[in-house]
Amino acid sequence: MKILLDSVYIHNGGGKVLLDMICEKISENGDIDNYFFLFDKRYQPISQILKNTNYKYVNSSESKRKEFYKTNSQKFKKFLCFGNVPPPILINKSVDVYFHNDLLIRPLLNNTSIINKIKLLLKKYYIISKNRKNYKWCVQTKIMSEKLSKFFKISRDKIHVYPIYVTNFLNINKKTDNSFLYVSNFAKHKNHRRLFDAFRQASNKIGHNITLNLTIDEREFKDSFYNKLTTNNNLTIVNHGISNKSKLNELYNKSKYLIFPSLNESFGLPLIEAVLSNCYIICSDKEYVYQIVRPSLTFDPNSIESISQSIVNAYKNIGLRKPKLLVENKIDTFVQHIQEYV
């Protein structure tokens, strides 16, 4: 009997990066035939999975998930729900839920619209309603473990911490002076508007050209203030679009600084990737940061002035220090955990 890897709702952003890594590791280990993959219709899997016949695409809805589980759950010995949400029906077998969305912890406090807050709140209560005492949960940091236990009422002994990231970044040290990189999507909590205003302000203070590199979806960038509002001649903004692993590696190698003003993260994978690529890290003074790295400089992400000043300080090498990685990659341990008793 196989393991079901259910990744419905995962198709972009950090969730997709994590899913790609897990699938790649399973393939490397030669264990791919032990799995059946239930994919979100919008997800494009790595090539190794496409060579395997044990997968199915479904629309991103609970009704479609439920339909699949009702028809097929008896075929599987173990279940990994990778999209934050437990099985839609009761499963009396081994179940792991991989939780990696900090926005679901306290939805009403998020920096997003009222409609999104309500949607997230309803999803949170749905997740709680579907949890069972025999289910295990996996997160990436100790703080996420504490939040999940407190706000979802899950016993601590049911939560396991597995930081997961790519370690084989090619560091060829071709840094471009005065180049900043922000790896993120355009979600509101990523804090792009304050970042844009801070860079406009900082470029005026510095008086020399600085470059901000982005990885936003091309359509969102075209419709955004980045493209519509004017900047001075000292600021160059380049959007590279949604980037694959190879392109990201190139961007990290060319960029001297990673700037990361995000207000909420369950992990913050670009912070780790930046350390491995020998970038300085200028980022939000937030708890999620200190769970995984010691940054080069920090700022108040709610203050345009604070972000702007940190950009100036980085440019002038004021208080700048080499960042340090604080977490060990547990991808092998995680995959072993999933395959336990199978």
Model regions: which residues?
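Active-site donor-binding segments of glycosyltransferases and PAPS-dependent sulfotransferases
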Residues: 4, 19-22, 31-88
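Aromatic "clamp/platform" in nucleotide-sugar-dependent glycosyltransferases that forms part
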Residues: 263, 275
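Membrane-proximal helix-turn-helix segments that form the acceptor-binding/catalytic region
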Residues: 116-138
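Conserved acidic donor-binding segment of nucleotide-sugar-dependent glycosyltransferases
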Residues: 297-305, 309-318
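A conserved mid-protein helix/loop that constitutes part of the nucleotide-sugar donor-binding site
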Residues: 13-24, 187-201
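A charged, aromatic-enriched C-terminal amphipathic alpha-helix characteristic of glycosyltransferases
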Residues: 171, 316-342
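Nucleotide-activated donor-binding/catalytic signature segment of Leloir-type glycosyltransferases, i.e.
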Residues: 53, 224-246
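Conserved donor-binding/catalytic core segment of Leloir-type glycosyltransferases
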Residues: 4, 173-190, 196-199, 213
